[in-house]
């Protein structure tokens, strides 16, 4: 998720996803109904929704192609406590839903884990997240995604290393990392998302056609997913130059993170996801995750020689 285009990293697969379990456990559930069904007051269904005049957007309406990045504005970059996108090491999100591939709607599952690894990218120490994407039970993508929070509370996306698979066979590793091949950092989530504000870049990786942007779609929404029911939900719409007219909707609960994914417009994947499990991993489980993430990084140094191999190694606690 993700973010990956969290949650989806290929032009045809945008995920995300987007997280703070310790805080989440202290948040009381809203007064919604059952957990397995959408709240009756929910105004944005998980399937297609209509664009409203308040939130109509397009790549042409943006004010700037990428964001101004100041690497000196990251004094505590690995402490990511953004209200809408907190990232605490050991937090694991599991999403389930479906997406359309080859004209068929297939089960889709995403496992997004915040590791306890950090990695310096473009002069900023980032938090390493490990993201796995399954279609019809088969792994189609595994990815390392790199995030950091600036002193103003914005969460930045500084790159990612994805490995793509088809029928169990490795296909490609279209990595983009800020500072290489003209790639630039983008903002995954602003500290204070504002309705009506111009869209912003979530990262710029021209070598692999990464041009994702985000904009506030709606605020103050309610939604129910298997994990819980949430109020005051922020809904963001994401789009890219490669998919004009296709929008992914991501639902963010305060203090939690991404809890739902939907779509609108001409999105060929029509991806829908709901948060079905949220856990804080044990020390042993987190160590296992760290080991697997480091295995993925080791492959990255071999498969992405011009990009990832030029970075310094990830570091553990």
Located regions from the model:
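Hydrophobic helical h-region of N-terminal Sec-dependent signal peptides
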Residues: 19-25
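Conserved functional acidic sites
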Residues: 49, 53-317
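Bacterial signal peptide processing site
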Residues: 33-36
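A generic signature of intrinsically disordered, low-complexity regions enriched in glycine/proline
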Residues: 7-10, 40, 74, 154
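Intrinsically disordered, low-complexity repeat/linker tracts enriched for polar/charged residues
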Residues: 11, 38-50, 54, 60
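C-terminal motif of bacterial Sec signal peptides marking the signal peptidase cleavage site
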Residues: 28-31
């Amino acid at each position: 998720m993700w973010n990956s285009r969290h949650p989806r990293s290929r032009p045809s697969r945008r995920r995300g996803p987007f997280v703070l379990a310790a805080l989440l456990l202290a948040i009381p559930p809203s007064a919604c109904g059952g957990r397995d069904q959408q709240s009756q007051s929910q105004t944005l269904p998980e399937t297609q929704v209509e664009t409203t005049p308040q939130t109509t957007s397009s790549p042409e309406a943006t004010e700037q192609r990428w964001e101004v990045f100041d690497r000196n504005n990251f004094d505590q970059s690995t402490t990511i406590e953004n209200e809408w996108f907190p990232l605490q090491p050991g937090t694991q999100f599991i999403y389930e839903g479906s997406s359309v591939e080859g004209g068929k709607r297939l089960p889709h599952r995403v496992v997004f884990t915040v590791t306890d690894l950090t990695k310096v990218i473009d002069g900023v120490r980032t938090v390493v997240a490990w993201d796995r994407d399954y279609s019809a039970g088969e792994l189609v993508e595994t990815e390392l995604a790199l995030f950091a929070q600036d002193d103003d509370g914005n969460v930045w996306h500084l790159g990612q290393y994805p490995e793509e698979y088809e029928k169990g066979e490795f296909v490609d590793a279209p990595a983009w990392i800020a500072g290489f091949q003209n790639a630039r950092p983008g903002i995954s989530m602003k500290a204070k998302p504002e309705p009506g504000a111009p869209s912003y870049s979530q990262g710029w990786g021209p070598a692999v056609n990464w041009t994702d942007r985000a904009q506030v779609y709606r605020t103050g929404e309610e939604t129910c997913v298997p994990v819980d029911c949430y109020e005051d939900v922020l809904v963001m719409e994401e789009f890219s130059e490669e998919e004009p007219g296709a929008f992914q909707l991501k639902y963010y609960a305060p203090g939690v993170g991404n809890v739902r994914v939907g779509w609108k417009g001409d999105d060929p994947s029509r991806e829908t996801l709901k948060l079905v499990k949220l856990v804080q991993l044990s020390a042993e489980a987190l160590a296992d995750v760290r080991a697997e993430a480091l295995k993925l990084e080791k492959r990255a140094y071999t498969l992405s020689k011009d990009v990832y191999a030029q970075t310094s190694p990830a570091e553990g606690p």
